[in-house]
Amino acid sequence: MRTEYCGQLRLSHVGQQVTLCGWVNRRRDLGSLIFIDMRDREGIVQVFFDPDRADALKLASELRNEFCIQVTGTVRARDEKNINRDMATGEIEVLASSLTIINRADVLPLDSNHVNTEEARLKYRYLDLRRPEMAQRLKTRAKITSLVRRFMDDHGFLDIETPMLTKATPEGARDYLVPSRVHKGKFYALPQSPQLFKQLLMMSGFDRYYQIVKCFRDEDLRADRQPEFTQIDVETSFMTAPQVREVMEALVRHLWLEVKGVDLGDFPVMTFAEAERRYGSDKPDLRNPMELTDVADLLKSVEFAVFAGPANDPKGRVAALRVPGGASLTRKQIDEYGNFVKIYGAKGLAYIKVNERAKGLEGINSPVAKFLNAEIIEAILDRTAAQDGDMIFFGADNKKIVADGMGALLLKVGKDLGLTDESKWAPLWVIDFPMFEDDGEGGLTAMHHPFTSPKDMTAAELKAAPENAVANAYDMVINGYEVGGGSVRIHNGDMQQTVFGILGINEEEQREKFGFLLDALKYGTPPHAGLAFGLDRLTMLLTGTDNIRDVIAFPKTTAAACLMTEAPSFANPTALAELSIQVVKKAENN
């Protein structure tokens, strides 16, 4: 039906007869001439109808936005004065000789001249995806997956599919369950990741595996999360953690070079402890020049419990954040930041405004200055490298609250005051995570997943001091987003059972849930390691959007619903009966 795409026509096509298929993006009727902007997935070209082709001109008068049409015509060069430098096809136009209206369009529920609500865009997604910026994002996503496949093929990786209907295993979120009609009362789980299957593939001798795969997690959603998402999943045998990172870093550098024309250079490596200390986060945004500075040792003896308490508590922390030029912040802005950190459990936000350091106490403005002597204040200013015109914010509480609150404040202030250089790319690796974290109920939970190997520990050493264990894990972070994470896996049965035991999984439950894995570990398991990238998040970064739904063709809302198809929906009672499922209604509160 077509010979060319609208958006691919150039001066080299001048004089050629072409047939185009697409949609009316805009129509301008000048009486004796009608111009339309005709659009397809590759872009827009101007088509005009003149009186010499009366039948086509007459039919063109009926055109409206989003009519689906076919046009045959001749490509012509535009006059110099009519060239549109803002269009890729702006040097040419098509003189139409024939027009076919393939399908007409009703009045559109989306307005191309205004910003539509996200609810409307998701309900009429098939119209939203016609917009050039949305089409470009999905084209970029397709390019990324193509580049990934070629790179992985070139590096000896095999694309192997793993099951979608599998067994529920604890991986940190709730599973989506699928009832079995054949096995009454039993359920499959949709995979949160192919984690165990890819490890089993390593045990099967396929030493380099990858897969671009759908995963599912029934969890509370955030702006950058979806109940179903796509991973670039990777696993290797006989490779160390640095070797895995080297190959995966090369993949991401390749993507940025091909898609953005940017060489990311070598990625710096930072430990989890350093990232938390300097940035209050395990996914720091290195475009932001600000860092946290520990000052607890300077405040242990002050008669101000807000500072002295955490300063003398082994589980406490007092951190300072120097904001260059922050002395110009208004009282209202300071109060807003104080309320902001309360979201993370902080009780408030102390500060020192540095107006003129040379004047000592008279050169600062601070509600806590009366609790601090000149020597302590000077020591704080020295340690934070404060200069005239700066602001110093303080966080004082337990380590987690300080890290969470001050880390979030660092990011917010950096963005609000334009301190974060958004023209840059700042990738890094974060390594050496704690193996376990407190579950809040006196037990431990795996910080990554229970198949991650500890670093330089025997099973006996791990069992004796699990709280000291460092995971042989690594995350890739770009501009403050975790785009991928992985680890060296446990390849020894005793170690795996030790980890299960630390997590409170008894031997009976181990056999019930992971018997197949424990059996496989008995038969010459190779050392193996892997990683998974979030394809949606990578695409989000590479297309410059901050909304992950912009890079998924048919995404869910934050309530895990599809507004277009109205999924989820009630099931047919007959289908439920076949599955031996009865829906129990919750009793209404009186």
UniProtKB/Swiss-Prot annotation:
L-aspartate binds at E171, R217, H448, R489. Its EC number is 6.1.1.12. It catalyses: tRNA(Asp) + L-aspartate + ATP = L-aspartyl-tRNA(Asp) + AMP + diphosphate. GO terms for molecular function: aspartate-tRNA ligase activity; ATP binding; nucleic acid binding. The keyword Lipid metabolism does not apply. The keyword Transport does not apply. Its main location: cytoplasm. SUPFAM superfamilies: Class II aaRS and biotin synthetases (SSF55681), GAD domain-like (SSF55261), Nucleic acid-binding proteins (SSF50249). It is an enzyme of class 6 (ligase). Keywords: Aminoacyl-tRNA synthetase, ATP-binding, Cytoplasm, Ligase, Nucleotide-binding, Protein biosynthesis. GO terms for biological process: aspartyl-tRNA aminoacylation. PANTHER family: ASPARTATE--TRNA LIGASE, MITOCHONDRIAL, ASPARTYL/LYSYL-TRNA SYNTHETASE. NCBIfam families: aspS_bact, PRK00476.1. Catalyzes the attachment of L-aspartate to tRNA(Asp) in a two-step reaction: L-aspartate is first activated by ATP to form Asp-AMP and then transferred to the acceptor end of tRNA(Asp). This is Aspartate--tRNA ligase. It comes from Shigella flexneri. The lineage of its organism: Bacteria, Pseudomonadati, Pseudomonadota, Gammaproteobacteria, Enterobacterales.
